[in-house]
């Protein structure tokens, strides 16, 4: 989804030979993560998707401890999850994560949970960037350039 006309977005440039969208992170469903019906509990999906975002940030050189040390935090302001097909114990899954949009002080992320080629769930997240004081702040140019390889155009989104 394109930003509204007149809405500034962070200026980004793609880094040559950098990883590109989507970021992929494998996980295995563990027995204790199941609900009473033998399916992966809905709350675990949110945790898995968060793991996917954190792994992408780490790969981009934006680990949470480093961000905190530089005075930045990512704060989730909205999550929308669609549960399509259940996962069960022992399933080997892949979390795909992409950055859909970078704005001045927020970002929009798209994610998919896959079992092979089958999409089990999707999630869209809006995360604000704040200072350690909790107030919104702008993305630094370095943060934007590190996330650029994971940024997809509206037509490219797989997550």
Regions found by a protein language model. Name each.
Residues 2-25, 58, 83-92, 99-159:
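HotDog/MaoC-like acyl-thioester-processing domains
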Residues 31-89, 144:
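N-terminal first-folded block
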